[in-house]
Amino acid sequence: MSKIILTGDRPTGRLHIGHYVGSLRRRVQLQNTGDFDEIYIMIADAQALTDNFDNPEKVRSNIGEVALDYMAAGLDPEKSTIFIQSMIPELTELTFYYMNLVTVSRLQRNPTVKAEITMRNFEASIPAGFLCYPISQTADITAFKATTVPVGEDQLPMLEQAKEIVHKFNSIYEPVLVEPEILLPENEACMRLPGTDGKAKMSKSLGNCIYLADSPADIKTKIMSMFTDPLHIQVSDPGHIEGNTVFTYLDAFCTDEHFERYLPDYKNLDELKEHYKRGGLGDMKIKKFLNNVMQEELEPIRLRREELAKNMDYVYDVLKKGTETVSYTHLTLPTNR
């Protein structure tokens, strides 16, 4: 069996570092290992319309922005096929058929769907398309016979429901659908990076994001205003690591080499944490260190993005060719014939 990756993002805005550590960075690593036969990266514009149906221009205009972020972060069109979901009508067709395998009550019990409904204030009037989001994801995964799906922790219930649909389809008809393996981020901090304000989720709508395209000045401003430990008032006070956003970000981005370059008084993050917990280490010092780490990580991405943005014709040509490749060459709906 071919080893195939499918993953993607909804084009509702530029990508932020939550997307980056949650999935995008891992995609680039997997792409460059050469261990997979095919890697498909989907810009899920059709799914984005399920809660942006009254603002299609927002979705349309952000397709190019997401593609810029992809390539700036290191996704190579020669190694990964980047395509636009809405241009593949077979995915919508398969979604329709899979709807017969899932009850409305099961969709409503999906923890991710429930959380998203609450966040968007859809409780009184849930769009049917939004409720069927997990079914659409299942169609995407199975149409490409994906064996591996890199996701953030918040998407786990979606993938579990996809597996349920695969099992039911295979038991009713024939075992032709591939059940995908779930690939989570490398550590707990990367699974669900909190917003800069300490809230549980980094979200465009909450204004608590650091974007891949942010300027150095914007990144620094956001880091310096980040939530830390409200009880750590004096430098001498013992501090708490748990729930401290600065340390969560360091867990996601920091390596021992960063200490050699920017904070040589410490060998690694464990030593820094122990000093903070004892007291005698100020929030400003760790924020300055985080700023150095983040600037180093994001600068090459930002510079590549700025260069790519000078030639949007090339960016859209990549999307056109990727979508054509999927449409005419690789996409095969499930069959045993």
Listing of model-derived features with the role each one plays in the protein:
Residues 16, 271-281, 299-327:
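Short His/Asp/Glu-rich catalytic/ion-coordination signatures at enzyme active sites or charged loops
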Residues 2-139, 295-298, 302, 306:
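N-terminal Rossmann-like or analogous alpha/beta NTP/dinucleotide-binding catalytic cores
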Residues 61-65, 69, 161-164, 289-296, ...:
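A non-catalytic, amphipathic alpha-helix used as a structural packing/dimerization or gating element
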Residues 16, 70, 154, 249, ...:
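Residue-level preference for non-acidic, small/hydrophobic
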Residues 114-295:
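Active-site cores that bind ATP or allylic diphosphates and position pyrophosphate for catalysis
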Residues 329-335:
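Conserved small/polar residues in nucleotide/adenosyl-binding loops
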Residues 26-29, 33, 165-172, 332:
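Active-site catalytic microenvironments for nucleophilic, acid-base chemistry
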